[in-house]
């Protein structure tokens, strides 16, 4: 299905990460075929407001704070202002974590059931999830991708990506009481200045081809590191919830 996508910035709460890749680069077109653009209807058009990623043919994972009504999911996009051979879906069920806390953003994870199964091809693919015992270690460098603002605050129509270093949990704990290393990741080296920002929420933090984190929040405006949801902790919940979503 062809879709002409017009990107407009959505307004999100201050502490959430909603499409900004700072000091990153443009992704090779369709090199991250698991990426999803989440759009919701605002005014008289659909607007990109969060990222997500395909974990099964009809299931997209994202952040719980990205929950909106009338979500459209776009798969197979690179330039969201050009006509591309994308697949467009309505969401029939949204399942945020039942213990999601909108203040601390603890348990900031959600699964979306699509209206039909995606057709997997060269530009639309699923991404692997970690095992429950897999923990990303401080010093490891992984990648986040998203659509939106660049370092100069201009809007990008193309998918951007940036490599970010995992930090020790103490660094985030020292900046905020609302950090729990068992369910969250502390990401981004302050000395490098690379970051995620508005519009990237819900996108995957990918380490060696595995989605290890979900872009969640920043500790305070303009600061590093960022806080991501640690996916491996939620594997039992993910497995249980995917089974529930597959039921008629």
From Swiss-Prot:
GO molecular function, one term: serine-type endopeptidase activity
Propeptide cleavage-removed residue intervals: 19-20
Glycosylation sites: 152, 180
InterPro entries cross-referenced by the UniProt entry: Peptidase_S1_PA, Peptidase_S1_PA_chymotrypsin, Peptidase_S1A, Trypsin_dom, TRYPSIN_HIS, TRYPSIN_SER
GO-annotated biological processes: protein maturation; proteolysis
Cellular compartments per GO CC: extracellular space
Listed EC numbers: 3.4.21.-
Coiled-coil boundaries: none
Active site annotation, chain numbering: 65, 108, 201
Keywords for the protein's UniProt record, in alphabetical order: Disulfide bond, Glycoprotein, Hydrolase, Protease, Serine protease, Signal, Zymogen
Signal peptide region: 1-18
UniProt tissue specificity: Duodenum, lung and spleen.
Disulfide feature: 50-66, 142-207, 172-186
PROSITE patterns linked to this entry: TRYPSIN_DOM, TRYPSIN_HIS, TRYPSIN_SER
Positions of the Peptidase S1 domain: 21-243
Domain of life: Eukaryota
Functional summary from the UniProt entry: This enzyme is necessary for target cell lysis in cell-mediated immune responses.
Family designation: Belongs to the peptidase S1 family. Granzyme subfamily.
Protein's name according to its UniProt entry: Granzyme-like protein 2
């Amino acid at each position: 299905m062809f879709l002409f996508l017009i990107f407009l910035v959505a307004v999100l709460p201050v502490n959430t990460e909603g499409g900004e890749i700072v000091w990153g680069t443009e992704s090779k077109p369709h090199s991250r075929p698991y990426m999803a653009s989440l759009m919701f209807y605002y005014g008289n058009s659909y607007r990109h407001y969060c990222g997500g990623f395909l974990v099964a043919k009809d299931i997209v994972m994202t952040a719980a704070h990205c929950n909106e009504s009338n979500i459209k999911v776009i798969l197979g996009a690179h330039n969201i202002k050009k006509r591309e051979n994308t697949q467009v879906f309505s969401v029939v069920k949204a399942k945020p974590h039942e213990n999601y806390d909108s203040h601390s953003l603890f348990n900031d994870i959600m699964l979306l059931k699509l209206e039909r199964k995606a057709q997997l091809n060269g530009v639309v693919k699923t991404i692997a999830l970690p095992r429950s015992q897999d923990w990303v270690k401080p010093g490891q460098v992984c990648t986040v991708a998203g659509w939106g603002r660049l370092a100069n605050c201009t809007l990008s129509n193309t998918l951007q990506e940036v490599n970010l270093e995992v930090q020790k949990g103490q660094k985030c704990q020292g900046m905020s009481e609302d950090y729990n290393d068992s369910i969250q990741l502390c990401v981004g080296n302050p000395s490098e200045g690379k970051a995620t920002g508005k519009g990237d929420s819900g996108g995957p933090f990918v380490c060696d081809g595995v989605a290890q984190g979900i872009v969640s929040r920043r500790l305070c405006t303009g600061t590093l590191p960022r806080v991501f949801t640690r996916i491996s902790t939620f594997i039992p919940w993910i497995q249980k919830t995917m089974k529930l979503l597959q039921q008629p």
